[in-house]
Regions:
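Vicinal oxygen chelate
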Residues: 2-27, 35-131, 138-144
Length: 144
């Protein structure tokens, strides 16, 4: 692997730079609505939102969730990017307080799929599915 790859953005990187290692780029129906929902459910901070096109779609929404970038786009089937429902993955959200993050997500409209609980591997863990079909896994330290 190259020595030039780094997790953190280099010093002097402009505001709005991508934060984190691997960044999820989700194709959802209603990317701007999804971004608004993530503000409520996951305390997302908008970094950049491309204006919608004449059909109400946007090609790019950049958010920060818990200090890391998450990106969204509407499907553009005419450009080879059709809508495909989320399946076979979850977004892991490492947090200090699993219960409060999970509860905020559920209160905002996520479906509870696994209540917060202390797991055999040593973490506290919970899951919820958002209205756009994405499963979120909150993980953090066990309750004291």
């Amino acid at each position: 692997m190259s020595d030039t790859l780094t997790k953190e953005a280099p010093a002097g990187t402009p505001e709005g730079a991508i934060k984190g290692g691997i960044v999820a780029y989700l194709s959802v129906e209603g990317a701007i609505r999804c971004g608004d929902f993530y503000k409520k459910a996951f305390a997302a901070q908008p970094v950049h939102i491309n204006p919608p096109d004449e059909q109400g779609r946007t090609m790019h929404v950049h958010l920060l969730i818990n200090g890391n970038s998450v990106m969204l786009s509407d499907p553009y089937p005419e450009h080879g990017c059709p809508y495909v429902p989320a399946a076979g993955f979850s977004l892991m959200l490492p947090v200090a307080n699993v219960d409060s993050w999970w509860q905020r997500a559920v209160d905002a409209g996520c479906t509870a799929t696994m209540q917060p609980q202390d797991m055999f591997w040593g973490d506290r863990y919970a899951q919820a599915k958002d209205p756009f079909g994405v499963t979120w896994a909150c993980v953090g330290p066990k309750k004291a």
